[in-house]
Amino acid sequence: MLTPRNLMTFFLMTFGMSIHAELDFQSGCKDLIKSNQCIAAIEGCTVFANQGNPEAQTLLGFLYSGTRYGDFRKNYKQSFNWISMAAEQDYTKAQLAMAEMYKGGEVVPENARKAKVWYEKAAEKGNLDAINGLARLYRYGVGVRKDHEQAFALYQQAALKNHLASQVGMGLSYRDAKGVKKNLVKAYAWLSLVSDNMEDRAFKNIQKRYEQERENQDKTIPQCKFILKYDEFDDLFALGYAKRELLSLKQRMGLKQTKKGKDLAVQLRQEIGQ
């Protein structure tokens, strides 16, 4: 007979097992990647991947295709197989990775239509990177008929939720009159919104640090720790791109237009809650 005490005991045991399993996954997979123990990470992540852990499967896929240097040989087939297993479990990050693989054409042959399918699966669950991916397909007509209005709508959907790359997309759309009437003030505002996330000096310091890390990498051993920083790299790329395009845009605008753009950026920041 189930009593309140029995239920509490069952709950604590189940919760404790869950926490223990998560800690094991952290130390037995993710921490090994973080400390750049690439071969050990593959072995450790494989244990959890074989247990059906979709995050482990995705990380294992990244390890097989993203590890570089040393005597490591990439295995694109294994990478695709593990990531597709996670994607079929409805793991959003894996679905996004499937889209990027089909779009990039390195791990598997390029197939923009399949990329669109996987972007849509992840976008349906609100993944902002996937929404941005769809926007790029429509903007450039990759795998779909070029549709600037649809691209703009998708950029806007993610931009209003503070997705940096989509905010850059908004700025470029207004600048180039793609899917919306040309408006340099609004273009300036959106690009400024992204650029202002980090001061120029701080951004340059981060750039310098990453460049030094890359130059000082020991290429005699496998390198894999950076695969945990993919999202961070994407945001830094968006920041750098926004700063560069904003500087170029300033040269086309007068002082009054620039001031209007700055004021609008403040308004947008308040509306978005940035």
Where are these regions (language model features)?
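Hydrophobic h-region of N-terminal signal peptides that target proteins for export
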Residues: 12-20
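N-terminal leader/linker segments that initiate helical-solenoid repeat arrays
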Residues: 19-51, 55-62
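Hydrophobic face of amphipathic alpha-helices that form TPR/SEL1-like repeat modules
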Residues: 28-31, 59-68, 97-104, 133-140, ...
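Structural signature of tandem alpha-helical TPR/SEL1-like repeats
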Residues: 34-43, 71-82, 109-118, 145-154, ...
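Short helix-capping/linker turns of helical repeat alpha-solenoids
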Residues: 50-53, 67-70, 88-91, 104-106, ...
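TPR/TPR-like alpha-solenoid repeats
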Residues: 63, 86, 101, 122, ...
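Terminal, low-structured helical/coil segments at or just beyond the last alpha-helical repeat
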Residues: 209, 213-274
